[in-house]
Curated annotation (Swiss-Prot):
Active-site residues, record numbering mapped to chain: D81, D268
Subunit note: Monomer.
Pfam family, one: Asp
Name of the protein: Cathepsin D
Annotated catalysed reactions: Specificity similar to, but narrower than, that of pepsin A. Does not cleave the 4-Gln-|-His-5 bond in B chain of insulin
Keyword presence, Disulfide bond: yes
Residues covered by the Peptidase A1 domain: 63-378
Amino acid sequence: MKLLILTLFLATIVLAQALTVPLNFHQASRESRRRVPQKWSNRLSALNAGTTIPISDFEDAQYYGAITIGTPGQAFKVVFDTGSSNLWIPSKKCPITVVACDLHNKYNSGASSTYVANGTDFTIQYGSGAMSGFVSQDSVTVGSLTVKDQLFAEATAEPGIAFDFAKFDGILGLAFQSISVNSIPPVFYNMLSQGLVSSTLFSFWLSRTPGANGGELSFGSIDNTKYTGDITYVPLTNETYWEFVMDDFAIDGQSAGFCGTTCHAICDSGTSLIAGPMADITALNEKLGAVILNGEGVFSDCSVINTLPNVTITVAGREFVLTPKEYVLEVTEFGKTECLSGFMGIELNMGNFWILGDVFISAYYTVFDFGNKQVGFATAIQG
């Protein structure tokens, strides 16, 4: 079984100090989806404990695109992730015994005329172990935008097979500096401080139309042709992840009672699903008629999509409706097609905490407004 994911390839259009990067569809294994609970449990528990180390993984969804580092540029594919804040890539100094380094592009500081040594130790703790290395400084180019003097990590150890066979080389985080390892300014911060983009925001449009352009990531701009109606903004509750209040969750127009007084949610481009408390998601999937296998909802027959109810997520007083075609993932592996629920249960011990991933972002054009500390949603135009 494979999951639909979205892969970001380098292709850029620069308009008035803005950068737009088209996206394409790809697939990832079903097994990777099952690691979502462990990933987020580690990530948010660390935050709750007062640490500033972001913990994330990307097996379940991958937005990756080409960047270059150094002069002349050395090419890498990186995940663009709103759930972390650091940039890291494999180092040429990584031992050949580290498979993840051996199978991916590696940064060679000796080949760059703009490299500046730093050497500070760098570690991120993942569910499968620690990614460790050291900090370096160099120019980073995304499309036609070159960020000078960017601090990033050269990885010399990467944990688990998820990194060994990933389609990406490294990760480019798009969350806040407050959760950045070693308090390193994220790439988007430096885009702003160096005047490379004129607006303090970036936005995602994702398409789930088979065979169509997978979407786009825009730095410094909002593409008015990719959504309809108004953008509804919700203020952030923390300047860590892109976190905000989620008012309610309804099934077929009736509140499910999941939120009580309120829920908190994170909008994360590094997660393909909508994730929530295990008990709530189990009840939801059972109500939808999905069979729970290995913690995920599986429908016995894809024809049931036509009989399932809409679900509604309320944010900032606005109801954001998801139809069955939007929250059910129809996936094929080895010639067999199955339909999976787009809702995954997680145990965080943090109350009513939800993660709105690609299932939600593909239905609603999403604006990450750093300057005004808010996230905006509008009905995405598909097709």
